Design a protein with these regions (language model features):
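Outer-membrane beta-barrel translocator/receptor signature
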Residues: 159-166, 174-225, 249-252
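Outer membrane beta-barrel strand-and-loop segments of large Gram-negative receptors
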Residues: 367-370, 520, 526, 537-595, ...
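N-terminal periplasmic accessory domains that precede
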Residues: 66, 96-99, 115, 134-135, ...
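Extracytoplasmic beta-strand/coil segments of soluble accessory domains associated
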Residues: 97-130
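Short, acidic, small-residue-rich periplasmic hinge/interaction motif at the N-terminus
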Residues: 50-89, 109-111, 151-152
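Face-selective signature of the C-terminal outer-membrane beta-barrel domain
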Residues: 207, 253-278, 301-453, 477-483, ...
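Short acidic/polar hinge/loop motifs at secondary-structure boundaries
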Residues: 96, 102, 129-155, 198
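Outer-membrane beta-barrel signature, preferentially recognizing the C-terminal barrel domain
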Residues: 413-419, 463, 492-546, 563-576, ...
Length: 737
């Protein structure tokens, strides 16, 4: 570690002419720990030199401090992976979305779509505050992130159905400062995207404030084909929609955040976020379908325009209420206005028959979330954490369509949807010499209501669920570097609104969606076992699911070629998974690898037979970073998955290889990162095949993920700790650690 300190020296009285030259050529080398260096960097240094007759007094005062260090980017603590962002190349990649693309253990499967290897899509938190509807991937800057914590085994503290958790811990300024930073990310794929933004930050005493503005234009072009096969008694109907799906969006986002640190143990955060987005999607399709006697060609143009305005108010409080007690409280309230216009224009090439429909969907969401956590100590060295969560969604929706096949009640209706989930949890934990154990449970009560008014009818329905979801963990550390752990967790999959809606919504002339009022909740019990020896972790995970809810597509009427998509309770399923991860530093090179092998056990009905999903599949992630110098870092991230089966879904193999170079220039004022994504052009996670009853449907084609991304961030000004010197002469003292 090298600390360069610009020093002002002042001579008060001397007769020795050579002392000046000696002081200006002074080069001090001191070995210290990182903690010592941090403390010294905050203190003015006074040095006194004396001669026999006269004395020389000079002040050494710090103007700027440059710290260069290397440490492992990621480490494992129990079931949690901690990724150090501050001080690494990850903190210089622009925004959170750019950072997650290069983060070890994370797979990118689509635009702002990320998965934890072996666990699936995570739930996001920022400083412990649950993220609900905000777009954090472009608004949170990577330079403001201290670390991210990836929890692979979320317990009763988190909402039911949480596969994994990513908690983003931001940096808290320690000194009075003011800064203005500019950012821009330009991405060149089939279509060009750009995200310029600026962030103004100020810290004075106990108050910290920031104002961020983001403008984003995003373009995406997927080239894929949707297919459907219906097995009739005497023939097979097949349709293929060759589709160019072009989506373009424009958004403006303003975030105003304030932190008040009343004391080192009490912090209040207030955040306001406004987001405006216009999105246009254009599908140009050639539809080919074959029935018993003929082949029909149709030209289809589908357009969707969406206008969204969102206002979000967030609050969180963290405080120490006693010697061994802590309180965390967060609240989040969003108002979302969403207006969607959808058109479908179908023209038969042979007969020139045209079928045009217009659908309007105007809705307003009110979304409120409150989370509470309280840690305290009990007798017999037992630690306890209790808390709760309240989640409320109120959705008012007006739906109208001109589709010819829709019935009178289906053509227009007004819907009011309410979903309330109240939860409370309690966790008890105890530590012995080398054993840590935790046991707890989460109780959740849900109340879902729907009220639909059509032209001629009114419909009301409600459903309540009440569930207790236990969890337990044991960690045994027989010696340093060796750790064994076991976890158990139960989660629930609720029916939601589709479990109450009786009406159908037509997508086009050959398909529609429908609700299912007969749905039951699904439950999953997961047992996990891990062994860690230094940098190597091995794991085994078993899960059993009852009544899992999945969307299926089938043909309910053999006299037509129209398919229906609806949610159903599937048969019981089992999953066996073997997990391995390894992290190691080799000088300037850091490697992180994660791999998972999964064996499913599931059966479903297709073409009158019972089909079994039992093929072994693999997925993984390999990450390399090389510290070239204090100014340049090279990195690469490779994610892969093999052919895999999940319930009645089959997904083809896919991979995503990215590589990049990150540079810090102009005394760290300018950061540049150049990233190449989907280098092999194999990140086609949209190659899917669904089978159920008499119908097979899915997609094949290519995603728009291959391209080049250039991210820039520039600090216009940043006033940190500054101590004025007392002499005009300046010198650099190098401290090497």
């Amino acid at each position: 570690m090298v600390l360069q300190k610009y020093v002002n020296l002042r001579h008060l009285n001397t007769k020795q002419s050579n002392i000046n030259d000696k002081l200006l050529l002074m080069n001090i080398i001191v070995r210290r720990t990182l903690l010592s260096a941090s403390i010294l960097s905050l203190m003015p240094i006074m040095a006194n030199a004396q001669t026999d007759k006269d004395s020389v007094n000079y002040d050494l005062k710090l103007d700027t401090v440059h710290v260069t260090a290397r440490r492992p980017i990621i480490k494992t603590e129990g079931s949690k992976d901690i990724v150090h962002v501050k001080g690494s190349y990850l903190g210089k990649l622009g925004n959170l979305g750019n950072m997650l693309v290069a983060t070890p253990g994370i797979s990118t499967v689509g635009p702002n779509m990320y998965e934890v290897v072996g666990k699936g899509a995570p739930k996001y938190y920022v400083d412990g505050r649950e993220v609900t509807s905000q777009d954090i991937f472009k608004t949170i800057k990577s330079s403001n992130i201290d670390r991210i914590e990836i929890e692979r085994e979320p317990g009763g503290k988190y909402p039911a159905g949480t596969n994994a958790v990513i908690n983003i811990i931001t940096i808290r300024p320690l000194t009075d400062r003011i800064s203005l930073d500019l950012y821009n990310t330009a991405t060149f794929k089939r279509k060009v995207s750009e995200n310029p933004s600026f962030e103004f930050k100020a810290n004075k005493g106990v108050w910290t404030s920031s104002l961020t503005y983001d403008y984003a234009t995003f373009g995406n072009l997927n080239k894929e084909t949707y297919f459907t096969e219906i097995a009739h008694p005497d023939y097979t109907f097949r349709s293929d929609e060759s589709n160019n799906n072009y989506m373009r969006s424009f958004s403006h986002t303003v975030t105003f955040a304030n932190d008040i640190n009343f004391s080192p143990n009490h912090r209040l955060s207030l955040v306001y976020n406004y987001a405006h987005e216009k999105e246009h999607t254009n599908d140009t399709e050639t539809l080919t379908y074959k029935d018993r006697t003929k082949t029909t060609l149709m030209d289809v143009i589908k357009k969707e325009d969406n206008l969204s305005n969102q206002n979000t108010f967030s609050m969180s409080y963290t405080g120490k209420t006693g010697k061994n007690s802590y309180l965390f409280l967060s609240a989040d309230y969003s108002i979302i206005d969403n207006d969607t216009k959808y058109t479908s224009d179908e023209t038969n090439r042979q007969t020139l028959y045209n079928n045009y429909s217009l659908t309007n969907n105007d809705g307003k969401y009110n979304l409120a979330t409150v989370n509470l956590a309280y840690n305290f100590a009990l007798p017999y060295k037992i630690g306890a954490e209790t808390g709760g969560r309240y989640y409320n969604t109120h959705h008012s929706l007006h739906y109208a369509t001109s589709y010819k096949m829709a019935t009178n009640d289906q053509q227009s209706n007004h819907q009011v949807l309410d979903d309330n989930v109240s939860a409370a949890y309690l966790t008890l934990q105890r530590s012995w010499k080398n054993v840590w154990a935790s046991i707890g449970g989460r109780y959740e009560y849900s109340d879902t209501k729907i009220n639909i008014d059509t032209k001629s009818n009114s419909y009301k329905a409600a459903r309540h669920t009440s569930d207790f979801l236990p969890s337990a963990s044991v960690i045994w550390t027989p010696k340093q570097g060796l750790r064994f752990q076991a976890h158990y967790n139960r989660s629930i999959q609720r029916q939601g609104y589709m479990g109450l809606v009786p009406f159908s919504v037509y997508k086009d002339s050959l398909s529609y969606t429908s609700g299912n009022t007969q749905l039951l909740p699904g439950y999953t019990d997961t047992y996990s076992f891990y062994t860690t020896w230094k940098s190597l972790t091995l794991g085994f995970i078993y899960s059993h699911t009852t009544n899992e809810i999945s969307n299926v597509t089938y043909n309910p009427d053999q006299n037509t070629d129209i398919v229906c998509e609806m949610p159903l309770n599937m048969n019981n399923s089992d999953s066996y998974q073997i997990f391995a991860s390894y992290r190691k530093s080799f000088g300037k090179l850091f490697f992180s690898g994660t791999a998972s092998m999964q064996i499913p056990r599931f059966s479903y009905e297709y073409l009158g037979k019972k089909c079994k999903a039992s093929k072994v599949s693999c997925s993984g992630n390999a990450n390399l970073s090389y510290f070239i110098s204090s100014h340049f870092t090279a990195f690469t991230n490779f994610s892969f998955q093999s052919y895999n089966e999940r319930l009645n879904r089959i997904q083809k193999a896919a991979n995503n290889w990215m590589a990049g170079l990150q540079a810090n220039l102009l005394d760290d004022c300018l950061s540049i990162s150049l990233t190449f994504t989907d280098i092999l052009h194999k990140a086609n996670y949209n190659n899917l095949d669904y089978r159920y009853m008499n119908t097979r449907e899915g997609t094949y084609g290519s995603n728009d993920m291959r391209g080049i991304s250039l991210s820039l961030s520039y600090s216009l000004f940043n006033q940190n700790l500054k101590v004025k010197g007392s002499r005009n002469d300046q010198e650099v003292i190098n401290r090497t650690m």
